[in-house]
Amino acid sequence: FISKTTFDIENNSTAFDYDLDLDSSSIKIDNLNYDKPANKKSNLKISGIFDKNKLVVNNLNYSESKNNILIKNLHLNNKYQVNNFDQILVNTLKDNIIINNFNAKKNENKIFVSGNKFEATYFLKKLNKDNKRKTFSKEFSGNIDFKVKEIIINKESLFNFSGLGQIQEGKLHKLTAKANFSDNEILDISITPVSLNKKKLFIFSDRAKLFLEDYKFIKGFSGGKLEYTSNYDNKASKSNLKIYDFKVKNVPILAKILTLASLQGVADLLTGEGIRFNEFDMNFNTVGPKIE
């Protein structure tokens, strides 16, 4: 542990320069799917200045084995929300496999993100959620241009992830993004403003299973295409989920009874291949954390 602290009485601020060993600390960063257990060698070098209203991190360098996070000129408010930054460089591994390798730069109101890999599971789960714990402050705005060679969602890889977006007052206001599972299978995501506070999220995926991990009532799922639409604001959302041409091995008893009305349904059950469905259509509303 090495530290240098300087107090500026006139401006009521404090400058700091720390070199910290974090071996005994456990560290978890959800949005990067990064998890360091205690008693693993790691180091944090950080310098900057703070007062009662803000924290400015001039340089941050975190390292642990082959994991590294570098941040330059990060400005935070007194709620530790991001007001601005110059650069964020991330390289992290999980089970000795690289899952994040990207570089984000901000120049005035333009944000450029490029890299080889990005673990996007957490990002997609939060697309239409306006959490109380906000990453960006109301002062943060900018136009985003991104291109990443590979993204990972629920342990599945997609390629050539690219698009444009816009952040206004700390919230994702617009987004168009595309990626490829293969030459003829795509993922398409968009967020468009509908009114002053309401937005529309649209997702189309040629592989539906990727987005069904959290639906506990659907098990043994295979095949299928997915189309998801959600109109939402910071209080509630109205959503529609459609899935086409898929099979499910474990389904509620009512679905089995209905499927047995067809000869194909009997054949599917006898072979153990699962029950075939042409289309699944579900509407649901959320108010806060509650689904209706």
Which residues does each PLM region occupy?
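Membrane-proximal interfacial segments on either side of biological membranes
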Residues: 1-292
